[in-house]
């Protein structure tokens, strides 16, 4: 169906790939235009070796290794010692680089075109996977994949975003941006899991929910809100892991659980850095500044107690060794389910509710700030006192009470 604001059809995107002149770029919705640019221009700024912009020094060292190996093969000279030395340099440089990635570099790794997706992880760590389709209401949203399977000794319901591997699949799946039907599909499968007493495992990897008019007309915000409410009271263990991008309500729609974890180089944010920059600075060029301000990396979110655990990735990111990343993810899920299945459903619900109520920290200050708070309405003072976590800041802090 055509987009009601632009007259754009998804079929047009296939034509644009073959010949961009057939479908003018100004007829494409902005978010699809960006995705199309990713497909046609060598996704996410990577070169032929899959290196990102900030990884260029590593690419140079790897090229040296390739040249030495080629010279050794052609001339027959023994260059093994030199190759070992350069490989050691590559390993050291990689460790140093990935020990302290900034927020924007983390976003680039999370979006790497070779990064494993939900179907990849399901294929590597889940046995007897049986996919389930449809929301029993309107249609089957391919941006969300659901199904029963076994992981370790546990039978589970698996739910996750599916961005797609090739161009055709990415377009069919809207690059992992789910419509309302996707979230209703996920909820229907969660309720099915609850009926059979089976734990739910959610793998989050989306830039956000689909932002089209059709999705709004069919109640995308309502669908996500209902999922938040229903996931909070599911009577089975729920484990959620951000495996790549965790964008806004699109991620939250399957992100309420007893355990919430992130891969080391994933990000989890209220908005994409480009979206934030467009709002605050009226230009996506400030995306790096926005990324730093949003505090959405795994380390920062763990410090804020917004997530429970950080899952280590192979050196260089999950795309460098998908099997090792899958092994780490499988271990975390199996151990989490082992612990959660020992807890009675009533206790599980109380803990989950308590966990949700304690999200966020409230900062208070003394002196002039205390006087300012005292001058507020009684209801406001009571709300401040009921804050789940109170951090007393130094007297030199700004004289305001804010929610972080």
Q: Where in the sequence are the language-model features?
A:
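Aromatic (phenylalanine/tyrosine) cluster motif
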Residues: 8-10, 14
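Intrinsically disordered, low-complexity segments enriched in small/flexible residues
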Residues: 31-155, 323-404
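Short active-site-adjacent helix-start/loop capping segments
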Residues: 116-118, 166-168, 210-212
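Intrinsic-disorder-associated, low-complexity terminal segments enriched in Asp/Asn/His/Tyr and depleted
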Residues: 3, 12, 19-21, 26
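Terminal peptide-recognition signature
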Residues: 61, 102, 158, 205, ...
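Glycine-rich beta-alpha loop segments
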Residues: 99, 128, 138-140, 146, ...
């Amino acid at each position: 169906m055509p987009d009601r604001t632009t007259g754009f059809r998804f079929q047009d995107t296939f034509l644009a790939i073959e010949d961009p002149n057939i479908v003018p770029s100004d007829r494409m919705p902005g978010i699809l235009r960006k995705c199309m640019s990713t497909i046609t221009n060598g996704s996410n700024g990577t070169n032929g070796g899959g290196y990102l912009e900030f990884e260029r020094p590593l690419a140079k060292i790897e090229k040296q290794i390739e040249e030495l190996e080629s010279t050794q093969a052609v001339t027959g000279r023994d260059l093994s010692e030199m190759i070992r030395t350069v490989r050691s340099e590559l390993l050291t440089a990689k460790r140093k680089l990935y020990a302290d990635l900034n927020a924007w570099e983390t976003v680039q790794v999370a979006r790497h075109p070779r990064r494993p997706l939900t179907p990849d992880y399901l294929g590597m760590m889940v046995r007897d996977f049986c996919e389930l389709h449809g929301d029993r209401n309107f249609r089957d949203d391919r941006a969300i994949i659901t199904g029963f399977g076994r992981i370790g000794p546990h039978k589970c319901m698996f739910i996750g975003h599916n961005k797609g591997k090739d161009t055709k699949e990415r377009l069919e799946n809207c690059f992992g941006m789910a419509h309302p039907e996707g979230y209703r599909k996920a909820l229907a499968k969660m309720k099915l899991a609850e009926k059979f007493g089976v734990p739910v495992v959610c793998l989050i990897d989306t830039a956000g929910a689909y932002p089209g008019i059709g999705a709004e007309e069919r109640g995308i915000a309502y669908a996500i809100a209902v999922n938040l409410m229903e996931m909070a009271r599911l009577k089975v263990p729920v484990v959620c892991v951000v495996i790549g991008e965790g964008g806004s309500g699109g991620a939250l729609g399957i992100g309420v659980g007893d355990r919430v974890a992130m891969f080391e180089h994933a990000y989890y944010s209220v908005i994409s850095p480009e979206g934030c920059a467009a709002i605050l600075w009226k230009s996506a060029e400030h995306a790096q500044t926005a990324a730093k301000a949003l505090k959405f990396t795994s380390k920062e979110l763990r410090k804020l107690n917004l997530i429970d655990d950080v899952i280590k990735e192979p050196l260089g990111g999950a795309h460098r060794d998908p099997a090792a990343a899958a092994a780490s993810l499988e271990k975390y899920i199996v151990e989490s389910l082992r612990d959660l299945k020992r807890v009675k459903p009533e206790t599980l619900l109380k803990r989950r509710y308590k966990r949700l109520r304690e999200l966020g920290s409230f900062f208070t200050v003394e002196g002039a700030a205390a006087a300012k708070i005292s001058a507020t309405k009684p209801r406001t003072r009571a709300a401040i006192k009921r804050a789940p976590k109170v951090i007393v800041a130094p007297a030199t802090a700004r004289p305001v009470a804010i929610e972080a």
